């Protein structure tokens, strides 16, 4: 006569795995397991498996709560650290796959057997699939965007050291005790019929590191005789400013980016972008304030960038030409018609920014300033999240900068502060005091210093040509910019 297994009393059988008697019961436990992984396995009398899954789930939640960022700075630090972000994305993907396995496994071990009706099989499978999809879809998008973000940071901000960017800055002290940080915004034109890049758009943005208040300075592309700082090797080469024999167009401010690396390679030291180093020093000499960093947007990709944002909204006061050359007598192929709150796609935004037929450089500079403001307005969190994949793909192709990766969280926080204030702009237009062909740089320095003075000072000493961006970009029918 056989004896019962050790630990089981004679006359009793060990309880085996349990299944639900009805499909709704099984689905209910499956839903509970989605919230509390392991609960379904415990109900099915798989004690060891259920306890292990439950313990691992609780441990994962506790670890995530401890490791997750608890404030904006922590979130930004994670977002701009590619290695940490990639690890977080991989771990999230693994946890998501494990969660799906637990949910599906719970239904498999609890569903009634045999199924009495075909609809039970179809209905149960559809419910579990929908349950998984509800969680997998949004989390999967977050994981995908995390990988895209890591790629963008690596592509744009990893190997971008220049010879002129500030030293002795850290994530803890990003501004090195300074009250302002100055960033040169460049629009570069490297079309198929041009040799090298010509920076036809040059806007120096000066941001208060405490408040985010911003003043921008629009510089004409045809500014001549631009001086370099006294301590620059370029000053020794051009003591009278950037000038020389031959075509005057080769000695304008917009030619510095292209010409200096050709004429004097490596003159400023090792750099990922020698042209950017040169134009930064030229703008510093022209304005009298240090240029810390640059951001260059290639016009050949500007169209894709705006399209990725879903377009921009600007006020069009006068018709803006598409194509056309005034000097050559070539008429435009079309016009952007006037109107308030015009929503422009990438193609039309590009021509709004660069259209030159029938307009002067100063009108074009004003439109470019309005484009910058429109892009800032579109860069709200909802729009960025909704279009992140397209923006990441476009941005990594068309944007270059020497802003260090470790300073990105500080710059994002500063940009958020800047959005709370109305920016001021100074355009250096031709006037009785200023001529791009024979500029008075002492006058330019004075204008810059006056514009950067505290707001209370402006009540008594208003800087010439200073405008409020919101007013300057408002709809004024028939009024040129």
Give the residues covered by each predicted segment.
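Actinobacteria-biased recognition of intrinsically disordered, low-complexity terminal regions
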Residues: 1-22
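Hydrophobic, aromatic-rich membrane-embedded alpha-helical segments
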Residues: 21-57
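Membrane-water interface of alpha-helical transmembrane segments
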Residues: 23, 50, 82-92, 121, ...
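Hydrophobic alpha-helical transmembrane segments
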Residues: 29, 33, 93-99, 299
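Cytoplasmic membrane-interface segments at the C-terminal ends of transmembrane helices
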Residues: 40-48, 99-122
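Membrane-embedded alpha-helical segments of integral membrane proteins
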Residues: 58-110
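Internal/C-terminal transmembrane anchor helices
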Residues: 116-148
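Non-catalytic, solvent-exposed segments at the cell envelope interface
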Residues: 143-481
């Amino acid at each position: 006569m056989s004896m019962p297994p050790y630990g089981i009393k004679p006359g009793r059988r060990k309880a085996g795995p349990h299944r639900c008697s009805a499909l709704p019961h099984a689905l209910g436990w499956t839903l509970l397991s989605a919230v509390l992984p392991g609960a379904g396995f415990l109900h099915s009398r798989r004690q060891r498996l259920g306890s292990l899954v439950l313990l691992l789930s609780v441990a994962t939640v506790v670890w995530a709560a401890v490791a997750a960022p608890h404030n904006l700075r922590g979130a930004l630090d994670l977002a701009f650290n590619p290695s940490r972000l990639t690890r977080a994305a991989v771990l999230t993907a693994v946890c998501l796959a494990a969660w799906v396995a637990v949910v599906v496994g719970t239904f498999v071990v609890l569903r009634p057997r045999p199924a009495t009706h075909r609809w039970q099989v179809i209905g149960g499978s559809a419910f579990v699939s929908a349950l998984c999809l509800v969680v997998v879809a949004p989390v999967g998008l977050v994981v995908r965007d995390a990988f895209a973000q890591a790629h963008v940071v690596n592509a744009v901000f990893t190997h971008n050291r220049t010879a002129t960017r500030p030293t002795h800055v850290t994530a803890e002290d990003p501004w090195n005790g300074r009250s302002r940080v100055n960033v040169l915004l460049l629009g570069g034109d490297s079309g198929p019929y041009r040799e090298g890049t010509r920076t036809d758009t040059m806007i120096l943005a000066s941001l208060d590191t405490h408040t985010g208040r911003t003043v921008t300075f629009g510089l004409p592309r045809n500014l001549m005789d631009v001086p370099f700082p006294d301590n620059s090797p370029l000053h020794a080469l051009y003591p009278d400013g950037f000038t020389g024999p031959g075509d005057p167009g080769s000695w304008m401010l917009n030619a510095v980016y292209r010409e200096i690396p050709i004429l004097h390679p490596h003159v400023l030291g090792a750099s990922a972008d020698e042209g950017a180093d040169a134009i930064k020093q030229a703008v510093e000499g022209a304005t009298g304030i240090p240029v810390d960093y640059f951001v260059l947007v290639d016009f050949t990709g500007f169209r894709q960038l705006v399209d990725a944002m879903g377009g921009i909204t600007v006020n069009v006061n006068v018709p803006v030409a598409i194509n056309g050359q005034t000097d050559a007598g070539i008429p435009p192929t079309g016009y952007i018609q006037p109107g308030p709150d015009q929503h422009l796609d990438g193609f039309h935004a590009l021509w709004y920014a660069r259209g030159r037929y029938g307009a002067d450089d100063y009108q074009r500079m004003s439109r470019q300033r309005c484009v910058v403001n429109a892009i800032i307005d579109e860069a709200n969190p909802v729009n960025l999240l909704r279009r992140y994949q397209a923006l990441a793909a476009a941005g990594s192709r068309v944007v270059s900068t020497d802003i260090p990766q470790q300073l990105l969280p500080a710059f994002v926080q500063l940009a958020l502060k800047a959005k709370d204030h109305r920016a001021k702009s100074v355009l250096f237009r031709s006037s009785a005091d200023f001529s791009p062909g024979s500029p008075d740089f002492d006058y330019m320095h004075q204008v810059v210093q006056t514009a950067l003075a505290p707001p209370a000072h402006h009540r008594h000493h208003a800087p010439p040509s200073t405008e409020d961006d919101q007013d300057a970009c408002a709809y004024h029918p028939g009024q040129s910019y």
